[in-house]
């Protein structure tokens, strides 16, 4: 009997909390090869240094509907020359209904970027290859850890402000 009551509560909670992907799209992208065509005539082996910068932001666009934008900037340098620079703003529109403030923050700051990253990675790989360079496959990113780190930094900053 107690088991039935627990299952019913779980079922009701599951019905209340709803998550749906409404749309995934490229909001903005840029590919630059500032040192072409000379970068292709290099005699040195292709072993560039890569720099990846990630950020994400979100905004509420309607009741229970949010846009999340994952921004990636990848810079490849060969020696002191920039081989290429890729910037992608991969976006998604998500319907989130019935979540508490903490859960909503985690979904928008971690779960949604996790959904968007494979799409952004594909755009980066495609642009780099079409730009005449060897394929670039970005490693997976732990957005849960990044979100936790960001929350910890916010709490530390808040605690520092209170002390002053």
Curated annotation (Swiss-Prot):
- Main subcellular localization, coarse class? cytoplasm
Entry's transmembrane regions: none
Q: Does the keyword S-adenosyl-L-methionine apply?
A: no
Q: Provide a Gene Ontology MF annotation, just one.
A: unfolded protein binding
This protein's record includes keyword Chaperone: yes
Q: Which GO terms describe its cellular component?
A: cytoplasm
| Pfam hit, one | SecB
Any one biological process term the GO annotation gives = protein folding
Q: Give the domain of life.
A: Bacteria
Tell me the compartments it is located in: Cytoplasm
Cite the entry's keywords alphabetically: Chaperone, Cytoplasm, Protein transport, Translocation, Transport
The record's annotation in InterPro entries points to:
SecB, SecB-like_sf
Assembly, in brief, is:
Homotetramer, a dimer of dimers. One homotetramer interacts with 1 SecA dimer.
Function of the protein: One of the proteins required for the normal export of preproteins out of the cell cytoplasm. It is a molecular chaperone that binds to a subset of precursor proteins, maintaining them in a translocation-competent state. It also specifically binds to its receptor SecA.
What the entry lists under HAMAP family is as follows: SecB (MF_00821)
Family of this protein: Belongs to the SecB family.
Please give the name of this protein: Protein-export protein SecB
Its taxonomic path starts at:
Bacteria, Pseudomonadati, Pseudomonadota, Gammaproteobacteria, Chromatiales
